[in-house]
Every structure is written in structure tokens, then in C-alpha cells.
Amino acid sequence: MKARGVSHIAICVANLEKSLEFYKDILGLTVKMHTTQNMENRPGAESEEMYDHPRKSRTVANVWFDDPVHAEPFLVLTSHPGEQVGGIPIKLDQKGISHISFGVDNVKKFAEELVAKGVELAGSLEDFTDANDNIRTIFVYDPDGILVQFDEGPPSN
């Protein structure tokens, strides 16, 4: 038996609409499902191992790439209407899933577009510039302060 790939990545957010502005409106992903679900009788909903405390409902948005060749995994953004969500985003050197990364063709141009749209870089462009004056990767913060990376992949030479 073996896993065949990553199905989805779920991110609990404080404000789903703000997160959708980032992932849909700024990054260009497509919402394929957006609904509020009653948590009563959901598998695992009462599990203290899975939830910090019992929740009444959750709002879920499945956010996909438009590229049919590289469509998976998709993102599942969840929030709990009328309830606070706990926790703080972690850094790259802390235990847990530290960030999500998206591939782009031109990181420097993409970074300039993100900054023009008001997205905060996690550092300056100089922080991401290598010895050859290339920018191949950057990190930004999503609306919940979660680190999001954009990279061009490994160099071709």
C-alpha cells in the first residue's frame, strides 16, 4: 500500500472572506465550493485530538488552481463563524507545517505585483537576492500571518 499524492492542504483561518481576497483575488485561485456546515454528527467533530474545543459550525471554501495539469493539491480554507480560532502561525524552524509554496515563472516580477497589491513580504527583496543578484524565492504573509512561499524551482543549470 502507498499514498498516491497530496489530496489537499487545509488551513484554518480567522476570517474566511479576508483569506479569499488573498488566495482568490490576489493569487488568482478559483473557489469551487463555499459552504457553511453544521458540525453536529460530523466525523471527528467531537474529538479532542482533532479540535481545540467543540465547534457548532464551520465555513469551508475549496480553492483550486485553474491549471488542469498541475491542479492538485487544492486548498481547503476553513473558519468557524462567530467563534474565535486559537493558535499562532509558526516559523520555518518550528515543529509543524511551516508554510505553503506556490511555483511561479518569475519570482521578482511576481513579488513586485504582490507588493503593488498591498501584500506584505516576509523580509525585503534584498533578503531573497542571491550572490548572482537573482531572486528565485520569496515569502509573504497571508491574512492570518501564515508564511506563503513563491519560487521558480531549482535552477536549470
Model-derived features: where do they sit?
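Active-site scaffold segments
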Residues: 19, 99-102
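Helix-adjacent hinge/juxtasegments
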Residues: 68, 74-79
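Eukaryotic phosphotyrosine signaling hubs
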Residues: 8, 97-99
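A short, acidic/glycine-rich surface segment
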Residues: 40-48, 83-88, 123
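Core segments of cupin and vicinal oxygen chelate
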Residues: 12-71, 133, 139
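Long, charged/polar, surface-exposed segments that mediate recognition or autoinhibition
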Residues: 93
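Vicinal oxygen chelate
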Residues: 2, 11, 34, 102-157
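Acetyl-CoA-dependent GNAT
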Residues: 77-82, 153
